[in-house]
Design a protein with these regions (language model features):
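Glycine- and acidic
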Residues: 14-22, 46-52, 78, 103-108, ...
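Conserved C-terminal alpha-helix-loop-beta "cap" of PLP-dependent enzymes
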Residues: 78, 222, 227-247, 261, ...
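PLP-dependent aminotransferase class I/II
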Residues: 208, 243-259
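N-terminal entrance/gating region of PLP-dependent enzymes' catalytic architecture
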Residues: 1-48, 335-336
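Amphipathic, well-packed alpha-helical segments that form the structural scaffold of globular domains
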Residues: 32-39, 43, 66-69, 97, ...
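Catalytic cores of large soluble enzymes that bind and process phosphate-bearing ligands
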Residues: 18-30, 56, 84-88, 111-114, ...
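Surface-exposed helix-capping loop/turn segments at secondary-structure junctions
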Residues: 39-49, 74-76, 287-297
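Conserved PLP-enzyme active-site core in the AAT-like
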Residues: 56-226
Length: 359
């Protein structure tokens, strides 16, 4: 890449990567191919896919929520309300405030996933207001999954936009028997798709060395959004309305992340995806057998996250474990979690289990 001038002097991916750029030094070609290849993984229509490489998963969530807000306001003439759960990533709460939207907190099921029945109840309470729903596939602490199909069914007949935050799980589920959880396609002929847009982090499952994110939606939905977006601004000097909130964008990351669409990288990702789920199962079994007092849990078989009672500062500090308090019998109890990533080998897990034994 350096020999081609990328990262040698100022490149800029400003604008829509699917439009010709007035700035000759960009990597839009890499960016387009990356979006198309990941669009295939998520089963978007090949002739109706749009997206770009963002600065982070939060940046991708911002574009999804802003697109939803803009489209729904354009259709209904009033701002939507944002629906999400307390298990959603904290960026969703920040973005709700940033976008000036009223939030509707939906209750969760015991596993941490969104409660579809409570969503129905909350939608009925706001029947005349569009709904911008953020579903999480892989919640940050528990690894829970909001059932996208159930949510979409509950939204039937209600003006809505469904954005999926799949920051971690979106990276590996397409390579597992659970790939349908990430698929845009639906067997329901009355629906255009299972969701409207999706955010996936590049620096989580893929191990990309710096924060970046994928944002993918339908080209037709993007065009509806951009028709409203162009009324807000129209920067003539870049020859088109960019369609992104961020203006100047990194050119190095799309060129580097393109590697993850190559056959060898995809094969490695498939191996890694199988491995992390296998090792997560192993860790859970070992903790149930040897440390039942830690109450280790796994939200579902799709998750590579195991959470358990806080084992103490020494373990937490050595392994940089995230911690938080969860309600247990209506009392806050300290918990920690392990996220089993590709670098977490059996040797690492054995050392971790030994440290638990010796604490």
């Amino acid at each position: 890449l350096f020999k081609a001038g990328i990262d040698a002097f100022a490149f800029n991916n400003v604008g829509n990567p699917f439009k010709e750029s007035p700035i000759p030094y960009n990597t839009h070609d890499f960016e387009r191919e990356t979006i198309r290849e990941f669009g295939k993984l998520f089963a978007f229509p090949s002739d109706d896919t749009w997206g770009f490489l963002s600065h982070s998963g939060t940046d991708s969530n911002m574009h999804g929520m802003y697109m939803g807000r803009t489209i729904l306001r354009g259709r209904a003439g009033l701002l939507p309300k944002a629906y999400f759960t307390r298990e959603a990533h904290y960026s969703v709460q920040i973005l709700r405030d940033l976008l000036g939207l009223e939030g509707v907190m939906v209750e969760t099921l015991p596993d941490g996933g969104m409660d579809p029945d409570d969503l129905t109840h909350k939608l009925a309470e706001n029947a005349n207001v569009p709904a911008l729903v953020v579903a999480t596939v892989g919640t940050t602490f528990k690894g829970a999954i909001d059932n996208v199909d159930h949510i979409r069914e509950k939204l039937r007949g209600h003006a809505s936009y469904l954005h999926v935050d799949a920051a971690l799980f979106g990276g590996y589920l397409p390579f597992t028997p659970y790939a349908v959880e990430m698929s845009y396609q639906t067997s329901d002929a009355t629906l255009s798709g299972r969701y409207d847009s999706i955010a996936v982090s590049c620096h989580k499952f893929f191990g990309f060395p710096s924060p970046a994110g994928l944002f993918i939606t339908r080209q037709s939905l993007y065009e509806e959004f951009n028709a409203h977006f162009s009324q807000i601004h129209n920067p003539e000097y870049i020859h088109h309305v960019p369609g992104t909130i961020t203006c100047s964008r990194d050119s190095v990351k799309p060129a580097e992340f393109y590697f993850f669409t190559t056959p060898s990288a995809l094969a490695r990702q498939a191996e890694d995806a199988q491995l992390i789920l296998k090792n997560a199962t192993y860790l859970l079994d070992q903790m149930h057998t040897h440390f039942p007092q830690l109450s280790a849990m796994r939200a579902n078989p799709l998750s590579n996250t195991i959470y358990f009672r806080n084992p103490g500062d020494a373990i937490v500090d050595k392994y940089s474990l995230a911690t938080m308090h969860l309600d247990v019998d209506n009392k806050p109890e300290g918990f920690a979690h392990v996220v089993v990533m590709p670098h977490v080998t059996r040797d690492v897990l054995t050392e971790f289990l030994t440290d638990l034994e010796n604490r």
